[in-house]
Amino acid sequence: MEEIQRYLQPERSQQHDFLYPLIFQEYIYAFAYDRGFSRSILSENPGYDNKSSLLIVKRLITGMYQQNHFLISPNDSNQNPFGARNKNLYFPIISEGFAFIVEIPFSLRLISCLEGKKIVKSQNLRSIHSIFPFLEDNFSHLNFVLDILIPQPVHVEILVQTLHYWVKDASSLHLLRFFLNEYCNWNSLITPNKASSSFSKRNQRLFLFLYNSHVYEYESIFVFLRNQSSHLRSTSSGVLLERIFFYGKIERLVNVFVKVKDFQANLWLVKEPCMHYIRYQRKSILASKGTALFMNKWKCYLVTFWQWHFSLWFHPRRISINQLSNHSLEFLGYLSSVRMNASVVRSQIIENSFLINNAIKKFDTFVPIIPLIASLAKAKFCNVLGHPISKPVRADLSDSNIIDRFGRICRNLSHYHSGSSKKKSLYRIKYILRLSCARTLARKHKSTVRAFLKRLGSELLEEFLMSEEDVLFLTFPKASSTLRGVYRSRIWYLDIISINDLANHKSKF
């Protein structure tokens, strides 16, 4: 049993990963910058970030070498601890370097799993790609759902302590702690505002990594819920062993929870065979076929678990209980709900015929049309009612360049929302973009839309549809004959992680 428990424990780093010397290597920052630059696929003109030049990196490393944190003088009160006069200039560089360095032990562990040196455990399913089978699951038999807003740590020290279980290099952790305390306001990092001039999307990588490591510890207590209902569940005995060890964790937690007044921990609470769990960013969903009382017990359990195990204040209002038949799940930029599909069946017995009305529950995932139209209206592609309008463009842009920009936006939206079961809203978005493109070109040439489309022919339509044919051929080579198959099938693309800004409907078009 001890061997089983040792295997099922969250994998920790058993060796000392000496990461501290890497902080002073120039190539680390070059790799970090190159990775962030190559992933900016949504920006039209990424350009070159002059704040990440090699000369500035050399000055930063020299300043860190020469800085002595044990010597404190009155003249150093306004001095930057890393030898930098401009905090906003050096903060993104250090953040990118730290993010690249602390991910090294996790990357090495993943590579060893892929090479077959270790068994790939269920924790590896906790990625953005595990959301796809979750949305494909059959929810029609479920009754209630918990919408959970995961609390954020009140202090960065909690994050550093969590990372200490994985990385045993004390020097790098001390420097990371010093950097976070000196530069960072945790609340503004998780929920950045427009007034923060030193904050950018690329600088979020380090803090999201620390936050996800923290949530990983929280999810380890009931990760088996995702395995049971997922299409990715393992067929080996690993899931059974994991569940046995999970009950052992719950029994140990009972000794803690019984100290709370009016609280009783029941093991049957976590033995419900039909539970669905998934998380994306700070929001998680827990669905079950249980009763309202059953879900209230889960709510009480989660609140107590956060407060006692993580020393975080978790307000009960962060968890809402909703009946699935009257509630839509907002997740990953999709809306999912259980709907009643009515059907009429004619039954005939000898000379008598009967009409039988059947109501079948169906779980549908569709595109949230209202937020998308609001985003398009904000970007001047249409008005608030969804009517396409012309977009002002520079006079030096060629027609092919304008068509390519509109087509790229349309392809990204179509690519991202291709997993929806209802395509009608997606057709409307594509219609808005296509007509807006035509009106923009007609405005540039001082012509009417009808005359311009007649002169342009099918070129504009091919630009908006050609990419879908190519993707269909790569994904389903046996069904690439008709375009109709694209609209009816549900396709989940694995590179959706690169364009997940569309989930927040705040993408800059």
Swiss-Prot record:
The answer on whether this UniProt entry bears the keyword RNA-binding reads yes
Which keywords accompany this UniProt record? Chloroplast, mRNA processing, Plastid, RNA-binding, tRNA processing
One GO MF term attached to the UniProt entry = RNA binding
RNA-binding among keywords: yes
Per the record, the domain of life is Eukaryota
Entry GO terms, CC: chloroplast
InterPro entries named among the record's database cross-references:
Domain_X, Maturase_MatK, Maturase_MatK_N
Q: Which cysteines are joined by disulfide bonds?
A: none
Q: Which Gene Ontology BP terms does the record give? A: mRNA processing; RNA splicing; tRNA processing
Q: What is its main location?
A: plastid
Where is this protein localized, as stated in its record? Plastid, Chloroplast
Physiological role: Usually encoded in the trnK tRNA gene intron. Probably assists in splicing its own and other chloroplast group II introns.
Could you tell me which HAMAP family the record lists for this protein? MatK (MF_01390)
Q: Which family does it belong to?
A: Belongs to the intron maturase 2 family. MatK subfamily.
Q: What is this protein called?
A: Maturase K
**What are the leading ranks of the lineage?**
Eukaryota, Viridiplantae, Streptophyta, Embryophyta, Tracheophyta
Gene this chain is encoded by: matK
